[in-house]
Amino acid sequence: GYERLTINEGFVARYHNNKISISSITSYQYLDDCMTLDQDFSPRSMFTMQQMQKEHTLTEEIVIRNANPLQRWQWISGAFLFGKWLDMSSPVKFKRDGIEGLILHNTNTNIGNVFPGYGLDIPNDSFVIHSEFNIPTYGAALYHQSDIRLGRWNLTAGVRIDLEYTSMDYN
């Protein structure tokens, strides 16, 4: 099955005079979802995985541009920042057919070759292997573009600098 909750919100503020126009765009997104999959895709009761994630994303962009569209030199400059915080859990649940067919059969076949007469037993009908992830991502960008009209010609030049950082903690 699959369940999802998403919340999005944004805010825009603008300032304008006869020389410049400034705008600020702020957004927030919250995501909470849960997906359960039969990982072996067979009629046997092998194992399932459940992936649950909660994500918060915050962005901010500030844009400054000249306000007179009739000027020969048109320009735009801006800054963009974002942060994303993702917490994800992906537990895998081994069921009886998976324990016997994937784990015990393979393990006991190989243990018997090295230690004759010994083997492994898992009496449980199921067990869970937990996987927890924390994945923050941050980014920033600065940009500028200039357009100069030269008669019938239009000269455009721009530059953008992007920085991004991400990490992952796994338990």
Language-model segment annotations:
Residues I76, L81-N171:
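Signature of Gram-negative outer-membrane beta-barrel scaffolds
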